[in-house]
């Protein structure tokens, strides 16, 4: 029986990173923060890159850190990355929030937090409209380019509806499957091969 020895050969898809694109970690990355992660690039310049891990939910809720949200339905909180873990970031689809930074068409970062709080406290829907993160992921100048050359990441573009979907359990696998059959084997590879 002939086995294709290239199916696990990690190879980048050569899509260039830019604001609004996602990074998908390769399946063999053994890192507590970035293993099996999907990272939305918030900025990518010659000086460096910034992103938010969008598929790693924390065991606490936004309600635990924002006292005004104490008596409303629990709002999930995600680990945006290992930098500035005491800082709250938020992605949203609310175009009328003053000071919000456009990330892609219809998707924004931060802005006037009082307006975000007001929106939530008025009983408006949060799921699929706002996602909160503690910390962010950052790369120094040329660091992300080096990691891409080392095939640590694949770069892709996703729709906002997918990025803001509340169900992130299988997001890494789904992101790989959307890239085509070449990456399907990766998506099925066990996280801990010795447990297979």
UniProtKB/Swiss-Prot annotation:
Which superkingdom, per the lineage? Answer: Bacteria
Q: Which InterPro entries match?
A: AlgH-like
Gene Ontology CC annotations of this record: cytosol
- Gene3D superfamilies to which the protein is assigned, alphabetical: VC0467-like (3.40.1740.10)
Show the HAMAP family listed in the entry: UPF0301
- Similarity comment text for this entry: Belongs to the UPF0301 (AlgH) family.
Can you say what this protein is called? UPF0301 protein BT_1078
